[in-house]
Amino acid sequence: MTYTYNDGGRAESGRKGQTGDCVARAVAIASGRPYSEVYERLAKGNATQRKSPGYKTHRGNRGKNTASHGIATTRKWFKDYMTQLGFVWTPTMTIGSGCTIHVRADELPSGNLVLMLSGHCAAMINGVLNDTY
C-alpha cells in the first residue's frame, strides 16, 4: 500500500503541534474541503451534542467547542454531516465476524474514503493512505 503524508491543510490553517484531530483531518482530505471549515463544523457538533449520562467521548470532549480531542463518530449529527458531504456508511465488520477487511488497497473500494479504524480515523484516496502517521 502507498502512503502519503497529508495533514489535510491543518498547518496551512495556522494550527501547530500535536493533537487528536484525526477525524477533522480525514474528512478534510477525503471531502476536499478546507481543514478549517471541517474543523469548525465538527467543533460545533461537539459543542451542541446532547450530554447523555454515561456516554463517553474521546478525552472528555463532550459539550466543548473543539474538534482537537476526538469526535463522537457514532452520533447522529456526525452521520448527518457525513451524508451531507456525500459519504455513504459501509460497514466492513459485523459482531462476531472477526476482521475480514483490512486497510489494503485491494480490499477497499477505490475513490475517496474516510476509514474509521480502532481509535483512529484516516483518509484513503484511490488506494493511497493519506495521514500524518
Language-model regions: role of each:
Residues 1-60, 68, 76, 80, ...:
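Active-site nucleophile-adjacent alpha helix/oxyanion-hole segment immediately C-terminal to the catalytic cysteine
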Residues 49-119, 125-128, 132-133:
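Conserved active-site-adjacent core of cysteine acyl-enzyme catalytic domains
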